[in-house]
């Protein structure tokens, strides 16, 4: 079956047994009718995979009771799974991270714009996050489309950035004074003051769709290759500001049982920390990717 492209669709449309509703005009869609617990047919998986490529962020509603093994089985249909180098996974499922904020904690994990694992030589393809316990309000996740941000650049700036590379490292976030290293109350995270640095293109071509997008982020992009941090800061900040403009974003309002998947090759995300006094418990699988080009 040939799937419709987003430009051919309205705000809501039916594909076989799945119903897909767009979350914004730029990116994001929620999907009803998928059963990750019972398992997906090849046809249903193909629909979900296409929606993932089309919308970059997909929310699979109604997956209450999804087990760790079932979550891993779904994620593995996209690729092999990553074991986080700085955050301890579950004892029986090291590929899965439990992201927990207890009612008495003030700092959350992922509370700033970033792309998962861009500090690796082969950054993550995508992340699959399951909502186990959600607060009565707040705790939403924002997403920002880096291909849309690239499309808004002038031709002159696109030409300037083409061929440039940036240095990515975990030391900004997981260093001794880094934000993520401070989140050690309900999560076992270690510091990485001597984390390696890897060089990635500033403009990345998506390996499956061929679309170009920015591939830098505030958490892990340290500087442009061959530039000092001071020299890099003005241009990086301009690109960061453009990337997170509201017109490039969508918002996921979590419901218990949701499974949200996003494409780290072209999307940033930001977990909002506006639910103090309430518990939030998520479980994440991260899918290995390839070397950016």
Q: Which residues make up each language-model segment?
A:
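Fe(II)/2-oxoglutarate oxygenase catalytic core
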Residues: 13-14, 18-261, 265-293
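Generic N-terminal simple sequence motifs
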Residues: 1-2, 197
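Leucine-biased recognition of intrinsically disordered, low-complexity hydrophobic segments
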Residues: 3-4, 15
């Amino acid at each position: 079956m040939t799937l419709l492209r987003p430009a051919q669709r309205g705000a809501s449309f039916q594909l076989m047994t799945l119903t897909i509703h767009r979350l914004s005009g730029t990116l994001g869609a929620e999907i009803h009718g998928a059963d990750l617990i019972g398992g997906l047919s090849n046809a249903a998986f193909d629909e979900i995979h296409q929606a993932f490529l089309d919308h970059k962020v997909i929310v699979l509603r109604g997956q209450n009771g999804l087990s760790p093994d079932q979550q891993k089985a779904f994620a593995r249909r996209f690729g092999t799974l990553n074991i986080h180098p700085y955050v301890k996974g579950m004892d029986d499922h090291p590929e899965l991270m439990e992201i927990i904020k207890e009612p008495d904690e003030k700092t959350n994990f992922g509370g700033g714009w970033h792309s998962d694992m861009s500090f690796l030589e082969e950054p993550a393809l995508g992340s699959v996050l399951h909502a186990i316990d959600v607060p009565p309000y707040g705790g939403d996740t924002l997403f920002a489309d880096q291909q849309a941000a690239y499309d808004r650049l002038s031709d002159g700036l696109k030409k300037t950035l083409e061929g440039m590379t940036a240095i990515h490292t975990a030391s900004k976030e997981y260093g001794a004074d880094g934000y993520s290293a401070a989140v050690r109350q309900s999560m076992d995270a270690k510091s990485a003051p001597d984390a390696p640095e890897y060089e990635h293109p500033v403009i990345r071509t998506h390996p499956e769709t061929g679309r170009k997008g920015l591939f830098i982020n505030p958490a892990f992009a340290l500087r442009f290759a061959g530039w000092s941090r001071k020299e890099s800061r003005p241009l990086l900040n301009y690109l960061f500001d453009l990337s997170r403009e509201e017109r490039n974003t969508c918002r996921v309002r979590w419901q218990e049982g949701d499974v949200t998947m996003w494409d780290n090759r072209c999307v940033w995300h930001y977990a909002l920390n506006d639910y103090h006094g309430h518990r939030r418990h998520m479980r994440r699988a991260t899918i290995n990717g390839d070397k950016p080009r």
